[in-house]
Amino acid sequence: MKHTDIEVTLTHAEEHGLSAEEFSQICTILGRTPTITELGIFSVMWSEHCSYKNSIAVLKTLPREGGALLTSAGEENAGLVDIGDNLAVAFKIESHNHPSAVEPYQGAATGVGGIHRDIFTMGARPVASLNSLRFGSPKDPRVRYLVDGVVRGIGDYGNSFGVPTVAGDIYFEEGYTGNPLVNAMSVGIVEHHKTVSATAYGTGNPVLIVGSSTGRDGIHGATFASEDLSEASEEKRPSVQVGDPFAEKLLLEATLEAIETGYVVGLQDMGAAGITSSTSEMSARGIEKYGVGGIEIDLDLVPIREAGMSAYEIMLSESQERMLIVAAKGFEDKIIEVYQKWDVQAVVIGEVTDDNHVRVKHQGQVVANIPAISLVLGGGAPVYKREAKEKKPETPLANMVADSTLNFNELGLALLSRPNIASKQWVYRQYDSMVQTNTLTPTGQTDAAVIRIKGTNKGVAMKTDCNARYVYLNPLAGGKIAVAECARNIACTGARPLAITNCLNFGNPLKPEVYFQFKESVRGMGEACRTFNTPVTGGNVSFYNETFIAGQRTAIYPTPMIGMIGLLDNIENLVGSTFTASGDRILLLGNPQLTLDGSEYLVMQYGTPGQDAPAVDLEHEAQLQRLLVALAEQKLLHSAHDVSDGGLLVALAEKAMMNQEMPLSFRVHLSNNDKSETAIQQQLFSEAQGRVVLSAAPEAVAAIMALANDYNLPIQDIGEVVNQQTISLSINEQEVVNLPLSNVAHAYYHALEHALHLDEL
């Protein structure tokens, strides 16, 4: 029996991840039983990865307008934010978790390629890449294999494509052992009048496929990303796409030149679900905007690289480096000429129609004829409101010992050696961060990466962040903190936070406790974004990040990853994070209630994350951001670095070490009225929010303190930057830390390589 002759039944639908109710709904929409090609189309378009059917009801609660947004969330391939001078920033973050779990190198590489295509299909040139990675314990040999593959995949693709990888973060937690997270973010710059919409309109306008030929790689990749991982997932390596960064580089240049012709009407990347998603979504946008639309294509015209491909396979292929273009009728040859110049395929495969359907022909037959709106989010795709029920983590209480029994020198070195704290230089040295010559500082020298915008004095700051341990302990607070820390990092550079994108990584949404984590963390994100006036431009939801290995269920920590951009009006105001001058005063901004809950120290020393996330005061955070920007504009600061993972001692040590060309030490004197037996542990290692360590010339201190007072923010002078070989920290005039800077640096810079057993890779 031919593929096209299959008589579709409920069994086929269930094998495609569709429920009986959804199959019935499809039959009602079509007025008949779907063909196998139509079933494949519905299965990917109604998958969680494409339809957000389990998440959209919650996502709609996020602030999606305001600020400098030029597009609403979900309206286009990526968010678009006005930065003045007729320029806009396009940016987006997405996940490639499941592919990276079974094929780490290609999974990560194609994640990078896909997110860059989302940016340049809007007419923007990608100028920076970021990534956020989560792995299991580095003690596990398979985790080390995954780390190696993912890092090489990101580096090889990004370096070859010619876009700098400027920032990111990596955490190691047991819960990610079988299900790593690979979240990639791209940032691009575009002139307002050169932006392109992912919309099909204009009856009779030709539809072109451009880029690589279509193969069988990645078929059902979207569905694969919408189910739990298991041992059987290893068999789904064909669902992992294969990338070619050199082909994508040619595609980028050809596409930007084609846009310059003025004949590109609409443009969309072929990412998840390939030709299916691009034809469906572009048609639906055209109908929504203009009241009429649709696309008809002939698959016999699609360049394929494997013989005998069925319509089902061609429609669902996720072969990389492909895009769909709607051209102005009569000018398609002009566009084809541009692509031929760059040695990139460009072929007319159909046209825009006026019957509001996606119609697919193959070998002289219509194999799919579906109302476009029925396929997409906000149209006919199902929307579910799942049960949410809180299930507090059963974490043990920390059986803390008295400060008097502890050696804080040893504890400080041990904490700096933790994989979650230690330098990630082994990772970022594999990435080219300086290509395009716009990156203003080396990796790690600022709290957020900053890219210069050529032709202006402006810079764009960017950061990704999420401490999933906080979200696990308290989803509402954790969601707030993820946004707050991104904004704090951006403000530390002197930039003003503008907007966010998000990548929401969670377990199975059908489990009430998981859906509770999802809803509450999104609520926290929304509250923070409203307070900071940083609207949400869009993003990605990745559910089903749970694995079953040898019958044992393993769920990831809930990880709502935030990607944020900010604007630095004058790059001369850029503030670094490291000590720069001996004799500078060290100031501590912010004075919250100290707690060890959620801290890396508590996990290291007492084997528990505690009972709650640190508290966060959003109004305090907003004032902190405004103050940091004001201090930068008045050029009062030499450095600013927030207190986060590891607490105050780690923040001070990082400020001392991160400028490897000229490391400087510190003499810090703290006071503490807390008489408890664990007060020193709290003061050194608490990850309490809303704090920043500043350094400034002595003559600037009075002005800084006066400005902090104007913003009603507590600030204290805690010490001095010194050009010596040891760091020293005293509490109530008793020295509790005294370490050679060389020992501190060795612990910090070599621990990750040791933990990953790099000599064995």
From Swiss-Prot:
Keyword Hydrolase: no
Domain of life (superkingdom): Bacteria
This enzyme's EC code(s): 6.3.5.3
Binding site for ATP: Y52, K92, N502, G539
Chain sites annotated for binding Mg(2+) 1: E94, N540
Catalytic residues as annotated in Swiss-Prot or TrEMBL: H49, H96
Residues that coordinate or bind Mg(2+) 2: D118, D269
Gene Ontology CC: cytoplasm
Compartments it resides in: Cytoplasm
GO annotation terms (biological process): 'de novo' IMP biosynthetic process
Biological or metabolic pathway of the protein: Purine metabolism; IMP biosynthesis via de novo pathway; 5-amino-1-(5-phospho-D-ribosyl)imidazole from N(2)-formyl-N(1)-(5-phospho-D-ribosyl)glycinamide: step 1/2
Gene3D superfamilies given in the database record: PurM-like C-terminal domain, PurM-like, N-terminal domain
Catalytic activity: N(2)-formyl-N(1)-(5-phospho-beta-D-ribosyl)glycinamide + L-glutamine + ATP + H2O = 2-formamido-N(1)-(5-O-phospho-beta-D-ribosyl)acetamidine + L-glutamate + ADP + phosphate + H(+)
Record has Cytoplasm as a keyword: yes
A GO term, aspect molecular function: phosphoribosylformylglycinamidine synthase activity
Binding site for substrate: S95, H96, N97, H98, R117, Q241, E318, S319, Q320, S542
HAMAP family xref list: PurL_2
UniProt similarity note: Belongs to the FGAMS family.
NCBIfam families: FGAM_synth_II (TIGR01736), PRK01213.1 (NF002290)
Descriptive protein name: Phosphoribosylformylglycinamidine synthase subunit PurL
Organism of origin: Chlorobium chlorochromatii (strain CaD3)
Record lineage: Bacteria, Pseudomonadati, Chlorobiota, Chlorobiia, Chlorobiales
Name of encoding gene: purL
